[in-house]
Structures are given as structure tokens and as C-alpha cells.
Amino acid sequence: MNPPSKIKHYLQFKDFSLEEYAYLLDRSRILKAKFKNYETWHPLHDRTLAMIFEKNSTRTRLSFEAGIHQLGGHAVFLNTRDSQLGRGEPIEDAAQVISRMTDIIMIRTFGQEIIERFATHSRVPVINGLTNEYHPCQVLADIFTFIEHRGPIQGKTVTWVGDANNMAYTWIQAAEILGFRFHFSAPKGYQLDPVMVADSSRPFVHVFENPLEACEGAHLVTTDVWTSMGYEAENEARKKAFGDWMVTEAMMQRAQPDALFMHCLPAHRGEEVEAAVIDGKQSVVWDEAENRLHVQKALMEYLLCGRY
């Protein structure tokens, strides 16, 4: 074990280097093997994870809570109904208090600026469980899943069909760091925000008007719901706009013969993806969901203990 010399947070995918991701992805493989072999591994014995939820979730809560338990620690769940966060307590004050009573903090919230402010005033590592702008833990799990099934992602093509949301922007950061092509296709009005795409990332991003063309030669096709949390009022308008951006068998046929399909879930069959695709032989969504558990264990272990 080589404990970190200073506090490190995980707020965006770009917070870690290529070399750190190589370690984390290999460590995820090792921790998953321990889990499958019922091997006890408690490097975080008596450590406490605070989980702060301003946005509800099944997979995020379950994977973090089970993960810290499997590493020998325990979790405390907080939401805006159960804490002063929902009653106007300044973020800076909450960060000071919560970080003095826990060892690591995961936050699932709205604006990225909230978690950035929290981390600035935290005395312990902070992990982004999801914000409107980024979802790094999910993309880390997706990449680990791809590697499990198909080997290194470097030099491959990942196609995103759908909204320019937190997943898409996180994939863009990952493409630059890990060295793969990112194809993006969305209807007019739902395109990428240029402000959210760093100049250094642009060579890795290729935008297509036609989703079929975007899928051409892809090694991975992935998508998400058309209406993310907080945009429910736009649901009907989005359904009309995204009609041609449902991932279909025809799109998968344009991809590589052994292309994978992923979706971060929950999914709406018949909207962003055909049932035949998500339930088909190219889909790895259940492995993808499980792997949130293993990559987040590797992440928490790394932030608190360093390398083994």
C-alpha cells in the first residue's frame, strides 16, 4: 500500500491520467475476481462513506453502499429531506462538517459547480456520483466492461446516439485520455455545447447528422434516456425530436460485427433503444451495471489507500 500524500478528488473523468486509469482498470479486475471468489478484502475497515443524494438513484446508491461494505467500511445515506442541505445550509459549511465525520464522500447532485465547491472545502476525497454535466463513474464502468469483452479501447470507435448529456461529455474526456474515436449524433437543438468540449478533445470527436452513419464501423454503440432528470417538462418535445435516434438493429448492423451495445439504465424500450437491441446478444448492459460496483471499489480504495 502506498497512501496518497494529499487529498485527491474524482469530479470529472479528466481528473486522472492515462497511467492512473491503467492502474484503476486493472485493480477493478482484481477486486471483481475477489468478489466472484468470495474472498474477503477489507482495506477500508472502519472507514465511513457519506453518500449525499440530491438526485435519486438505484444503481448509484446500491453500488456505492455495497462497495464500501465489501471493502470493510460502511455508508451513511443523506438526502435533502434528511439534512440541512435541503434547508439552505451553505455548501461550504456542509463540506466542512461532513468531511470531519467521514472518510470519503460521494455526491449525486445537479450542477457541477455544487460538487466543485463542496470538494474545495472538504477535508476528505469527494467522488462525483453524477451531475448535470458529468458522470465519470458510469463511463469508467463502461470502459471496464468494454475491456472485459473486447480488450483495449485505445484506437477503437465509440458511437453515442442521443442527447448531449453528462454521459456524452464524459465520454469525450475519456476519448482524449484513453485515445479512441468518439462518434456523436443527435437531432438539431440537442447538439454538443462547444463550451463543454475542450480544444484538446476536438480531434477525437466526430459529429454526424445521420445516426446510421455515426454507427458505421463502431466497436461500441451506446445511448441514454432522451429526457434526463430535471428536463421532464420537455419529455413530449424530446420524444418527437429524437424519434430517428432510437438505437435499432439496423444501426447495430452498420457497426462492427462484434460491436457491443451499452446503456447506463434505466432504459425505455421502444424509445431510445429497440427491445431487440438491449435484450439481444450484443448487449452487455447487465455486466455494465454490475461493473459500477467493482470500478467504484477500486476508486474508493485508490483515493483512500493509494496503490497495492
UniProtKB/Swiss-Prot annotation:
Pathway: Amino-acid biosynthesis; L-arginine biosynthesis; L-arginine from L-ornithine and carbamoyl phosphate: step 1/3. Pfam families: OTCace, OTCace_N. It catalyses: carbamoyl phosphate + L-ornithine = L-citrulline + phosphate + H(+). GO terms for cellular component: cytoplasm. It comes from the Bacteria. Its EC number is 2.1.3.3. L-ornithine binds at residues 166, 224, 228-229. The keyword Amino-acid biosynthesis applies. Its main location: cytoplasm. It is found in: Cytoplasm. One of its GO terms (biological process) is L-arginine biosynthetic process. Keywords: Amino-acid biosynthesis, Arginine biosynthesis, Cytoplasm, Transferase. It is an enzyme of class 2 (transferase). Carbamoyl phosphate binds at residues 57-60, 84, 108, 135-138, 264-265, 292. One of its GO terms (molecular function) is amino acid binding. Belongs to the aspartate/ornithine carbamoyltransferase superfamily. OTCase family. Reversibly catalyzes the transfer of the carbamoyl group from carbamoyl phosphate (CP) to the N(epsilon) atom of ornithine (ORN) to produce L-citrulline. This is Ornithine carbamoyltransferase. The lineage of its organism: Bacteria, Pseudomonadati, Pseudomonadota, Betaproteobacteria, Burkholderiales.
